[in-house]
Amino acid sequence: MEFEQEYTAEEALNIEKEFTRLKGKHYMDHAGTTLYAESQIRAVHDMLAQNLFCNPHSSPLTGKLLQQVRHRLLRFFNTSPSDYSLVFTSGATASLKLVAESFRFRPPDEPESSPDEGAFVYLRDNHTSVLGMRSVVGTERIDPLEPEELLRHLKVSARCSGGTKPSLLVFPAQNNFNAAKYPLDLVEEIQQNGLSGYDDERFYVCLDAASYVSTNFLDLGRYRPDFVCMSFYKIFGYPTGLGALLIRNGSEDVLDKKYYGGGTIKIMLSGQNLHLKHDDLVTRFEDGTQPFLSIISLLEGMNTIQRLIPAANGYRPMERISKHVFSLAKYCYRKLGTLQHANGKKAILFYSDTRYETRDRQGGIVTFNVLKDDGSHLGFSEFAKFAGQHQIYVRTGCFCNAGSCQKHLGLTDEDILMFYEMGKVCGDDTDMIEGRPTGTVRVSFGYMNKKEDVNRLVDMINDCFVSKAVSNVAMVSPIRNVIKNEGIALKAIYLYPIRSCGGYRITAAWPLTERGLKYDREFTIVDSNGNPLMRNKHAEMSTIHPKIDPSLNFLILTHPFMEDLILKIRKLPTEFNDGESIDLGDAAAAWISKALRMPKLRLLRTSATDRKPPHKLLMINWDAMKTLSDDEGVESDATMSWLVDHFRGSLIVEGKAEEDLQGWKEVKIGKKRFKVQANCSRCPMIHVDQSGEAIPADSLKAIANVFTKKIPLGVHLTAVDEGFPEGVLECGSILEPVRQSDSPKAHIIKDSVSTRYNFLVK
């Protein structure tokens, strides 16, 4: 499968030298933010270190430099101050908000109370920041438009616009969901001929260019929207918090800015509400002191792009970047499209509006979900965790584009409201509800990406999620109607006295307090600054295996290469308050410092009430893990023991291997009752051997394959009330689950959505 190379070998090498921090990493979230080059930041540092930049309101020299940046940016978009005015803002969102608050939807001679107002029209595929404009625009006529309706205006001859009611159309140059590009010829078409069905309106066009300008050349000499909104970190990586609103000269007549800040007025009276704004458009719109140091830094952003990707063969730097990212996206789309399971079913479901045939219609983004071999979806949160362990950086969810996400996932408004009632909110990690995906995976490319990034992504998906042989283990639904619980019992209890250190197995009984297992995670190792040590940063912590002697109240520290240290667990003083801790002394400090080969460590005991809320107990189904591991060729008992320690499960149960723990709502273990909260989120961590033990690479890969199957191996147990039931948990106790019904709540929600939210759903 061919990849069309845009850069020369020398250019590719120079770009690679600028991003040494990417060694071993594969960053593919450039629609979120692109990356800054190392020389770019050094140049900014040198410029700031060697010059004195004063407040532009105080120093005309700084003001002149800002004007130079402004003119340079206009040239970057092939325009000039004679055609456009560039207003600096905090980003594309602030630019859109400024247009929304300022746009006058009535003719100048019409009072605000007049019903003769124009319309605000937006695409449903717009970013959330555009949808937010609906809340502040000065008109009641707010209409969504389907993309197909907008594109239709290029295919039919519309009337010549003779309307007088100022109206505003907002659409994206490129959809940030999947990089589908809209024909920019629409700008002039709408300006001249309006929209069908709006006979009395005179339309102005606001172009959301935030996604487009990140990897494309926006030619404002050819396409001339009335307003253009963008963020500069999307293009240059640095600085953040800076964007622009470009206003076509002449179109400012329809903007009525209400608020005024420092530097924007010609005269004002402090005792009376009297003021006159500046005649100059830019001065009038830029409230207060602009982030002048950030603005000056844009010079090095432009210099860097023009130096690393110079114009060649008649193409400007940003045009060459556009060609490069499109080639990567096309290569990625085709490579992913070849993935299929052993049973012949496809492994990738794309959410695209094109087939990646031309960069005029498609940008450098590929959006998809992974499908399992039974056709069900892999949740995007699960995918993100696996990707993270492979040093692959992507974006998951809906990317602040509710309209595109809803359309491509086939969700109705009622579905969205039902999901909300069931706990789903924007930005969370709830990726599946009733077997339906709530978001997607987005891969987006920048000028520093390479073909190898795509290959790494495809290899990871192929290794972790594509079945190589048809599984003989039956797939199970996330919600089960029938629970077969014959013979399911508590096999063992694992205690972890010191946070992030190894655990030890209890096969008899152990006390349960309202905060969890007694002594569980009650001790903490801290560094010289008092910061707790965590296992994900200090893997050698797993070589310390503390034990508790409950009869003598001893904490026994063990290490494979050191003598045991026995510490007396003394009764906590009655005045021991929340948030306090007790130092276990110099002997313990010396022992753990030697064991971990770090100086000045201390071992502390924290108050039980300080560990709020009550600790979750991870319950693991041993037989399901064993059966699936055998099916994947993982037969070593040592590997199985390593798994339990790796997941840090507290309760190990055995019984039916096919038991779906996620189908449980509550469970009784002996006489103790618990709430089943959620499935274990540590499964994707199997790629990291935190223990330092010799787990073969083949075993790790086989274990990874286990977790691509739809059989949850662990769930979190929490307290039914404010605290766990106190008493004793005994190994051998039978589990009595309370089943989760066939989602009666969902039916109730579905029936009530139209009545409860009819003021929202139109």
From Swiss-Prot:
GO terms for molecular function: lyase activity; molybdenum cofactor sulfurtransferase activity; molybdenum ion binding; pyridoxal phosphate binding. The active site is at C400. The keyword Ribosomal protein does not apply. Keywords: Molybdenum cofactor biosynthesis, Pyridoxal phosphate, Transferase. One of its GO terms (biological process) is Mo-molybdopterin cofactor biosynthetic process. PROSITE patterns: MOSC. Its cofactor is pyridoxal 5'-phosphate. Signal peptide: none annotated. The modification N6-(pyridoxal phosphate)lysine is found at K234. It catalyses: Mo-molybdopterin + L-cysteine + AH2 = thio-Mo-molybdopterin + L-alanine + A + H2O. Residues 590-738 form the MOSC domain. The keyword Transferase applies. It is an enzyme of class 2 (transferase). Its EC number is 2.8.1.9. Belongs to the class-V pyridoxal-phosphate-dependent aminotransferase family. MOCOS subfamily. Sulfurates the molybdenum cofactor. Sulfation of molybdenum is essential for xanthine dehydrogenase (XDH) and aldehyde oxidase (ADO) enzymes in which molybdenum cofactor is liganded by 1 oxygen and 1 sulfur atom in active form. This is Molybdenum cofactor sulfurase 2.
